[in-house]
Amino acid sequence: MNLTLKIWRQSDAKAQGKIVEYPISGIEGDMSFLEMLDVLNEELITKGEEPVVFDHDCREGICGACSLQINGEPHGPDRLVTTCQLHMRKFNDGDTIFIEPFRAKAFPVVKDLMVDRSAFDRIQHAGGYISVNTSGNTIDANAIPVNKDNADDAFAAATCIGCGACVAACKNASAMLFTSAKVSQYALLPQGQVEATDRVMAMVNQMDEEGFGNCTNTGACEIECPKGISLENIARMNREYLKASLKG
């Protein structure tokens, strides 16, 4: 398969970036998108040119690091997959593929296709956890009854990998889907009730401080999410936030 890649190159967050064109050949349909970029980088290194910087880690759709905008879509044309799970058979011989970093004020470019998504870490650190006293009086989790529907919904919310596709897909660069998933996975379980008020207030406030936009119910985030996180989580977080505001 012969392709033309048009890739965003940018030396750092303050530099002016540009699209650079790279022809590439010999690409097989069974290659992943990242393996295709590996082939390109091997060619660039052989020529003495600087390789394209992109983020990746597990390459199994778990870590959320491989966040790329491919032909204008977060993670590319396939659904419910991350970039590392996208195979080149989704493209045709002779195609031109545009590859860019995720675009958001809160995701500054580090270099080329890599962005700094530590804003998500700070939102998580603000309240995405449960405080536990482990000094000998911890109760076995299985001893606390949990409604099956709540358990299923909490598990579904917890599958969020924090890749940032929701932000990249949103016209407002909103992080509501990510934040609501992290709020929901605890709001639905008894273990999360003790800190529920402080959690939702702290996480939403941190989200706003990071410079993410607001949600206007477009729904692009749910469509592009590789884990299929539901918009229902945003509605739940709004309810949790309202309850917490009234208590405060």
Residue spans for each PLM region:
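Eukaryote-biased recognition of intrinsically disordered, low-complexity regulatory segments
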Residues: 1-23
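Short strand-turn-strand beta-turns centered on an Asx-Gly dipeptide
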Residues: 8, 25, 70-72
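Functionalized membrane-embedded alpha-helices
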Residues: 62, 68-70, 221
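Short, contiguous acidic and Ser/Thr-rich linear segments
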Residues: 20-32
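Glycine-rich phosphate/adenylate-binding loop and adjacent beta-alpha elements
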Residues: 70-94, 99
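Ferredoxin-type iron-sulfur electron-transfer modules in oxidoreductases and energy-metabolism complexes
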Residues: 31-50, 100-248
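Short, structured protein-protein interaction patches enriched in aromatics and acidic/basic residues
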Residues: 53-65
